[in-house]
């Protein structure tokens, strides 16, 4: 007996785009000498006394069992010839924005999940293209031609299946899951591959003798609810390829910010003000991209001793003017008590956001 009726909207056309080893791929693109070599984004343990973790790595490094969140020390032990790169997150964010602009050519219904992946609803796309597969191929082509990177794409009628499909063939793959193929596709998947099913849930499912999508399909809804509560309701539907979650292009952003951590501490006011300027310009650009304005400017300062100060100023009018943001953030810094310790982190954030208003001056 079903607790809730099964409603399966199969009319949508959803694409999930996942960049291939994104950070490492950007570094390889910008330094051809790295091609074909194991590249790890993370601090070199030989320079940090073994401290640090792997942010990500390329496919060559993955052959040695290296993966995200592994300690840099273990990564080095697995592959002493690996090339460690601390990473340039400002550059990665810039590339990520370039990719999102490509998405927007095809649809405004884009839900970024992180800097390197997003869902797109192309049911009613800007170009009137009926085939979601064709759009996915065009996006892959545009990203490769304009950005010099590859991505994997999953196409289906909901986000859950599109996400699984993008993981199915990497790198630079494209997998389509039609409604008539969904049950067969899911039946063969190990339960740990199901997006949204965490490690503890996998262990519990294994204890119940459930190892694949086929196993999960055979379990009554009430049994899953008894074991997992509300999540059991979701599991029952996942096994049947049912997920009506919309692509949320209208996520409410509460703030837009930019911050950087410095390996070399900042002491000189000229250097500090220069970094505040960079962050302010970054925030202004992000406000422009997201068609937002803000009133409250927040400066975050973290010193060498990890003392962290946060101070904000609310303006009388909305703005996204880079010079104004820089001026206010600089004034906030000037108002702080002097601290002889060097600065290890600076951040500028805009809050109290509102959508762009046509009659407000937006000059950057």
From Swiss-Prot:
Its EC number is 2.7.7.7. Mg(2+) binds at residues 18, 116. It holds the Pfam family IMS. Its cofactor is Mg(2+). GO terms for cellular component: cytosol. It is an enzyme of class 2 (transferase). The keyword Zinc-finger does not apply. The keyword Iron does not apply. The record marks 23 as: Substrate discrimination. Its main location: cytoplasm. InterPro entries: DNA/RNA_pol_sf (IPR043502), DNA_pol_Y-fam_lit_finger_sf (IPR036775), DNA_pol_Y-fam_little_finger (IPR017961), DNA_polymerase-Y (IPR050116), DNApol_IV (IPR022880), PolY_HhH_motif (IPR024728), Rev_trsase/Diguanyl_cyclase (IPR043128), UmuC (IPR001126). It is found in: Cytoplasm. CDD domains: PolY_Pol_IV_kappa. One of its GO terms (biological process) is error-prone translesion synthesis. It catalyses: DNA(n) + a 2'-deoxyribonucleoside 5'-triphosphate = DNA(n+1) + diphosphate. Binds 2 magnesium ions per subunit. Belongs to the DNA polymerase type-Y family. HAMAP family: DNApol_IV. Monomer. This is DNA polymerase IV.
């Amino acid at each position: 007996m079903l607790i809730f009726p099964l409603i399966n909207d199969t009319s949508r056309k959803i694409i999930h785009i996942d960049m291939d080893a994104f950070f490492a791929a950007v570094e390889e693109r910008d330094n051809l000498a790295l091609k074909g070599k194991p590249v790890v984004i993370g601090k070199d343990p030989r320079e940090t006394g073994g401290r640090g973790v792997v942010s990500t790595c390329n496919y060559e490094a993955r052959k040695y069992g290296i993966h995200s969140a592994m300690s840099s020390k273990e990564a080095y032990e697995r592959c002493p010839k690996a090339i460690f790169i601390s990473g340039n997150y400002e550059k990665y964010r810039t590339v990520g924005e370039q990719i999102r602009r490509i998405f927007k050519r095809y649809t405004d219904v884009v839900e970024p999940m992180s800097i390197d992946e997003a869902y797109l609803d192309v049911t009613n796309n800007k170009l009137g293209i009926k085939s979601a597969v064709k759009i996915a191929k065009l996006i892959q082509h545009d990203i490769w031609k304009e950005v010099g990177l590859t991505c994997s794409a999953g196409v289906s009628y909901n986000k859950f299946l599109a996400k699984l499909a993008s993981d199915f063939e990497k790198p630079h793959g494209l997998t389509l899951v039609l409604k008539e193929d969904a049950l067969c596709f899911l039946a063969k998947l190990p339960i740990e591959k199901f997006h949204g099913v965490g490690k503890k849930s996998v262990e519990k499912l294994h204890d119940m003798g459930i190892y694949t999508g086929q196993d999960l399909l055979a379990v009554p809804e009430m049994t899953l609810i008894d074991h997992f509560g509300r999540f059991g309701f979701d599991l029952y539907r996942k096994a049947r390829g049912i997920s009506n979650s919309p692509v949320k292009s209208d996520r409410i952003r509460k703030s837009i910010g930019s911050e950087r951590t410095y390996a070399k501490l900042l002491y000189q006011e000229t250097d500090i003000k220069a970094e505040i300027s960079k962050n302010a310009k970054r925030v202004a650009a992000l406000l422009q991209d997201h068609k937002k304005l803000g009133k409250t400017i927040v400066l975050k300062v973290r010193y060498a001793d990890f003392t962290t100060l946060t101070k904000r100023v609310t303006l009388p009018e909305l703005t996204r003017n880079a010079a104004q943001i820089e001026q206010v953030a600089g004034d906030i810094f000037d108002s702080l008590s002097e601290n002889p310790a060097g600065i290890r982190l600076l951040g500028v954030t805009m809050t109290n956001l509102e959508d762009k208003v046509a009659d407000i001056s937006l000059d950057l």
